Amino acid sequence: ITYGTRRPINPPAGIVVDGNEDIRGYFEGNGRFQFTPHWSVTGSTRLTTDDTFLRRYDISRDDRLRSTVNAERIGEDSYFSIAGWAVQDLRVTADAGQQPIALPAIDYRYRFDEPWVGGRVNLQLNSLGILRTDGQDTQRAFASAEWNLRRVTGWGQEVTLTALARGDAYHSDENADTITAIYRGMSGWQFRGIGAIAADMRWPFVGEAFGGIQRVSPRVQLVATPPLSNLAVPNEDSRSIELENANIFSLNRFPGYDRFEDGVRITYGGEYALDVPRLSLRASIGQSYRLTRKPTLFPDGTGLGSRFSDIVGRFEARYGRFLSLTNRFRLDKDNLTIRRAEIDFAVGSRTTYAEIGYLRLDRDITFNVEDLRDREEARAAVRVAIGPYWSVFGSAVVDLTSQREDPLSLSDGFDPVRTRLGIGYQDEGLEFGFTWRRDYDDTGDARRGNTFLFRVALTNLGR
């Protein structure tokens, strides 16, 4: 907490605003109460007085602060939760009246073995209320049953069969307050039924190689879902679409519950793994093809807008605990242009290390659908231990985005965003450090220029 000057984030052009003296601060807390072996209540909160306090004092770069409370019961085959969520949006363009409050969010799940043909059944009941002080309100409830059967054939193929049935009920009002039309849905009551079946086969081949064990696993999946009236219901939790190796084989490649992918598609790909002493390699790749000619609901630029999807994959290499390299990518289906490249490299020990990261997004998603702008960024960080308690550290972030990649960008292709250099001390009960930071962008009173920070923290109090 501090008493200082708070300046407007977007002052009128050409006008110098001095700002107001005010109390500014940030609060963060969390807790957990375990009432019985099954019942517990957890909660966490993050609140700040204004949009730029966290950046101004180098506490956090988060642009959204979430507060939640959750009462839950965890059983051997069941789960029950009643939760509430609130979000404080710190983005410059955010409208406070459009920020959702999720209350209540109720979820119940129960699983059991199916006695006739085998397999596992998962039942789920879920309801959610979304409230806004100046925007669209939405209430949703659904009930679903999902059956999964996994078998290994005599030739070693892993075959998984899935069947899903779900019924949804929605109610919404003030839908016109949602700016993006495809997210609104139709006001009043709307109902939707969902059915899906899938067959997934993976065929692992395992053998010795390079003094270790390698595994090659081709994989193919077929999913079929009848046509759905997706646009009739509001879209609150299925907006941020990102095709990647983690969801290419998912039953529904939309996030959340409000949108469900319909039609018939086949997904194919493979995985590779190699384990030798101190060295581990992992790789995966996949692509899908829609057999249905019906236009897809996925926007252009998401990698799923055409019948053939983009190609997605991941590569990971580890050498003991000393070195790690991870590369996630998405390639254009037509010309293999890199639509997404994300590289993380780390070398060193827990106390002395160097990290390098690179991100390039070239998705060409239209701005009137979602705020997933193209960008390119590089970042680096290093820490060197000096004895058992002292260390020096530094980091840098550089914006590599050009106007060719993003017409709205002001970057020339190499613009530093932030650099940092410091020295720190840490033992069992005390932490302190001195940091010099230079910012190259203005956000309200988080001004560009040099900042010097001295930080002290007492740890393990009461232990």
Give, region by region, the residue ranges found by the protein language model:
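Outer-membrane beta-barrel proteins and related beta-barrel translocases across Gram-negative bacteria
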Residues: 1-463
